[in-house]
């Protein structure tokens, strides 16, 4: 699963997801892509599940690019803990995704195969997405 090798700070504020994605919203590497239509946090487990399902469907043919990286730590407090005594410890990593962001790209396969592989990956995502073709 994806996670940063090191970060400047162990914990982050939650922040808020306003507006649309102005960066990472064009197809750069492949010919077909999966684009987010809603804002969400996508965990490293979900990214990996989507990648595995696409790779399994494409088998040897084609290449897959992951365009998002989980760089935000999410902290969780232990269960049945009283309020106070600081912020919880980092539990997992998420990628902040805004509408318009390209999640995965694919190339070197036919459109039918790419559409099917990307739809399988889309079913693993917690948001609505769309299939996009470059050009």
Curated annotation (Swiss-Prot):
A GO MF term: rRNA binding
Assigned keywords, A-Z: Chloroplast, Plastid, Ribonucleoprotein, Ribosomal protein
Subcellular location field: Plastid, Chloroplast
Ranges annotated as spanning the membrane: none
Alphabetical list of Pfam families matching this protein: Ribosomal_L16
Assigned GO CC terms: chloroplast; mitochondrial large ribosomal subunit
Biological-process GO terms, alphabetical: mitochondrial translation
InterPro entries: Ribosomal_uL16 (IPR047873), Ribosomal_uL16_bact-type (IPR000114), Ribosomal_uL16_CS (IPR020798), Ribosomal_uL16_dom (IPR016180), Ribosomal_uL16_sf (IPR036920)
Subunit organization: Part of the 50S ribosomal subunit.
Name of the protein described by the UniProt record: Large ribosomal subunit protein uL16c
Organism taxonomic ancestry: Eukaryota, Viridiplantae, Streptophyta, Embryophyta, Tracheophyta
